[in-house]
Amino acid sequence: MRTLIGLLVAVALAVPGQADAAQWGLSGEVGVARFGGTSRDSSGATLGPYRPTTFGLRVDRELGAVRVGIGVLYARTGLAGEQDQTAVVFYDRASLVEAAPEISITVARFGAGVVTRVAGGPSLDIWDVDGASRTRIGARGAVALEWPLSGRCTGSLRATGVLSGSVMNRDETPAGVGRRATRRGGVAIELRYRL
């Protein structure tokens, strides 16, 4: 992880380009997330995090069509047991702090400054479930639609997907319950300020 962060910083500082093309940016986002996987028993019942509101901050460096950055995300979530369209939710049982370096690339430009970007990178997820901390490494991908709001501000709608190890530890699942990779999908509205 340290090697990847070092590589991203080196690329951000070393990629040649026009002097005025390299821009730093600071973003804030608010979103919602939906989880899948985590643990499942033989009857099909699942247990996992349940639909939190997410808050994120990201600092990045834009080099033409490429943007390199690192983001931090926070979510406070409940744990839910779900089966046959029914959920039993235990609120405020877990929290997630995620650090995610990423590289994004512009894939399409539309009139009036609207841009579509794709992004990807690793994620480091630190979960606190009922006071017990656990760390998971995952992969993260995103698609964003950005539009200008003013000279220095852009807004965006961002869809993100993350795949990581199960939130549950081996000793937390009873017999007959299997741990599964945790999948997270999310949608967020973001405001970016060009520094």
What are these language model-derived features?
Residues 22-34, 116-118:
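Transmembrane beta-strand segments of Gram-negative outer membrane beta-barrel proteins
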Residues 45, 79-80, 141-195:
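Predominantly the C-terminal beta-signal and adjacent terminal strand-loop region
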